[in-house]
Amino acid sequence: MHELGTIHYVIDTVEKLAVENQLSKIASVTLEVGEVSGIIPHFLSDYWEYAKKKTTYLQEAELKIETIHAVTYCQSCGKTYPTVQYAKICPYCQSDNTFLVTGNEYVIKEIEAM
């Protein structure tokens, strides 16, 4: 359910940028969402459609969502691998001395103004 909070944060941020840059309308917002962030893209889209109606600059804006693939780094052998496929255990050396490099974040990648 944190998708609603995420959408409100994105809308607040974009609306502030629209004011600061004297924009009249926003055409689209592109979000990058990590594969293991816990954010469910179709919930983001649903909340976006609801929340944008209450804004000044985003009423007609499209939300574009791109996935950031989850990648884990193994400190034992120095290799990276796809997190979703192998989880915490390195498929090359079977070490659990690993950490997530990408895939847990979300980023406002692009804002397109009209």
At which residue positions do the language-model features occur?
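Cys/His-enriched microdomains
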Residues: 72, 88, 106
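Flexible glycine-/small-residue-rich
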Residues: 33, 67, 110
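Long, charged N-terminal interaction/targeting segments
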Residues: 1-64
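Short cysteine-rich clusters marking metal-coordination/redox-active sites
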Residues: 74-77, 90-93
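Acidic pyrophosphate-coordinating catalytic loop
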Residues: 37-38, 70-74
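Short functional micro-motifs and their immediate structural scaffolds
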Residues: 82, 95-99
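Short, flexible, mixed-charge glycine/proline-rich loop motifs
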Residues: 62-70, 79-84
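Short metal-binding segments enriched for Cys and/or His
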Residues: 100-110
